[in-house]
Structure formats: C-alpha cells, structure tokens
C-alpha cells in the first residue's frame, strides 16, 4: 500500500509540476491585451495601402464581370451568397464582431458570423504541413509568431502567414477575385494602437497569381467595452439564394425560384413541379 501511495504522490507531484511549468511558460503579462469584442471600423471595402488591387488583365476581366453581375442583381462570385464561408482575408473584414483568444501555442480568432467562422494561428514553432497531408480550407493554415518590437520584454505584434487556401474566394463584397490555383499566401501584422489600446489593426499583404505584384491593405477594429453581444447565425436559416448549374436564383417566401437579374433564363425544371414564369 505504501509503495502504491508513493507512486500516486509522485505522479501527482509530476502533474502539478508540469502544470506549473506551463503556467510559467505562458506569462500573460508578456502579451498584448486583445481580450473582448472587436468590431470593424470604416467601410466594408478594403483600405488599400498601395492603391487599387493590381489585377492581371485576365483577372481584371473577371472582376469587371463580377461587378457587372452585381449591378444586375447577381452575386458577383462572392461565396457568402451561396452560404459558403468568406475565407481569408474576407473573414477579417466582415461587419460581425470577433474575439481573440491567446494561448501559448495557438491564437484563436473567433468570428460571430454565419456558421461561426474561426481561425487557428499556430505559434508553437511548427513547420508547414506537406500539401498532400492537409486539405485546403477557406480559412487556410496559419503560422504566426509574437514579436517584441520595442524591446521592453513584452510582445507588440502577432506576425502571421497563411497558406493552403481553398477557392472560390473574394477579397470583399465588391467581388475582387483571387486566383483559383490555391497558391495564395497572406501575411499579416496584428497589433494594438500605441495611443489607444481599444483600437486594433490588421495589416494584410496578399501574394496571389491574380495580382501583378503583392497588394497591401489595412483593417481597423475597435473594442466594444460597453455591452458586447454575441449571436449564433445559421446560414440555412436566412439563405434566400440557390445556385443551379452556374446560375444563382432567389428563393421566394413560398419556395419559388425567382431571377436574380433582368431577363435571366429559368433553370431546367423538368424534375420539379414548378412551371416556368
């Protein structure tokens, strides 16, 4: 019995020592205070640092077609019209609030949007996974590191790189397209305003084959300290858009298909009990 007790005490001591070591390793005071609810500040379109998106001629034509489609009431290839996730970097630009949770190995960004989007930013020093070992996702795979820029022993900036992104995606609701080759790389610097700690910035630079050169954009959010409210929203509850073939249609309140633009051809309804209108 004494031997068993000794083993148990030793195991407990080891567990407590490990817990204490982890707690010591994660010194919360070293990290910026990014707790709370953050809400976007400014217009929904990207605030470009170095001018409009430098699209290649091919993808400028795609963008022009998206804009024309949206002018006529269509979705302009914006994925959220079809209940698909916004993906990176559009998910960092939406109107719904976000929350940042910092842990020693992972920083989570939780976004209170359709189907509750989230990001995992690994800060444990890992390498990139082989492309064959990782399925592309809309949020991509993000690796980051905390940086002490002013040398005061505290972290100021979270530097992030994101790869392995799934298509289709657009930069924002204006329909600026990404290349569909899955080779997009996104680099970010996330940091608090030095003068106002209730303001946070996300400097984003995108490397993409739809661009003639990297494109830098800046986003700003403010901490909601008064009465932060969170909601859960399921896309299927509010979705009024369906895609049949390559064409989108609205769903009316009584379940009928409606056109999304003038003179739109009706879909093939031979298998449905609905007449063409």
PLM feature segments, named:
Residues 2-6, 18-277:
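Hydrophobic small-molecule pocket/channel-lining residues, especially in calycin-type beta-barrels
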Residues 7-15:
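Sec-dependent N-terminal signal peptides
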